[in-house]
């Protein structure tokens, strides 16, 4: 008798494990963007694939492309299972505001910059899911609410912009259609050939919270974003002088 393939056997990653994978990928990405981009050793060709020169910088940035989809997926799960959606949204907005000066310094060396950090994108994605649920039975209100959110994302010029907000909403809407979510979702963002690999840990998600349970641990995870950006800014300033 043939054994049927059981996908649940491979679902071994908790939400906390995916958070740590996403965090590591994000930090690597930002190390590449902030420090390695100017480092000669990181831009030497290691090998070539289809006439494309692969460097350490390219590898680090490619790994970094996996972070955002995982964070978006975690956001949709948090939205579904949080005890208070209002508090969840407030926390996202709070850390968007906290992260803005570190983001501005890292990108321009100034306290004010033309684009906004990714927490604003996550917050707007949260609002998109919120109004999608609130106005399920009122298509007109849903349309104009979502339209307003997308316009705000364009005006704010938040990281990943309206495409990022749309990606979050798509993941939420396709939560019960894994194959469509993974294949179509990878085409939402740039470099779909790389982004598709971010759905590997997502597919391995076992719907368990994991070890990040307490409030201090949760806020420490949030704080890792502005803190590491600020650290990278100071390192870059010390090494490169800008």
Language-model features and meaning:
Residues 1-242:
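Alpha-helical transmembrane segments and their immediate juxtamembrane cytosolic regions
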């Amino acid at each position: 008798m043939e054994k049927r393939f059981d996908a649940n056997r491979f679902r071994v990653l908790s939400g906390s494990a995916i958070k740590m994978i996403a965090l590591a990928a994000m930090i690597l990405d930002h190390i590449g963007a902030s420090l390695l981009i100017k480092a000669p050793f990181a831009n030497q060709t290691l090998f070539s694939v289809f006439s494309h020169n692969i460097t350490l910088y390219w590898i680090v940035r490619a790994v970094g492309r996996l972070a955002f989809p995982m964070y978006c997926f975690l956001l949709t799960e948090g939205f579904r299972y949080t005890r208070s959606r209002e508090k969840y949204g407030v926390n996202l907005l709070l850390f968007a505001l906290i992260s803005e000066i570190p983001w501005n310094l890292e990108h321009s060396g100034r306290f004010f910059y033309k684009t906004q950090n990714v927490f604003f994108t996550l917050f707007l994605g949260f609002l998109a899911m919120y109004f999608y649920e609130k106005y399920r039975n009122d298509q007109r209100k849903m349309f104009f609410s979502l339209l307003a959110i997308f316009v705000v994302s364009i005006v704010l010029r938040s990281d990943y912009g309206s495409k990022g907000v749309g990606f979050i909403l798509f993941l939420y809407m396709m939560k019960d259609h894994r194959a469509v979510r993974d294949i179509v979702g990878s085409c939402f963002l740039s470099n779909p050939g790389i982004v598709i690999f971010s759905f590997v840990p997502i597919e391995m998600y076992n719907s368990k919270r994991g070890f990040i349970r307490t409030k201090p641990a949760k806020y420490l995870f949030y704080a890792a974003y502005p803190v590491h950006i600020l650290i990278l800014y100071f390192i870059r300033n010390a090494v490169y002088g800008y």
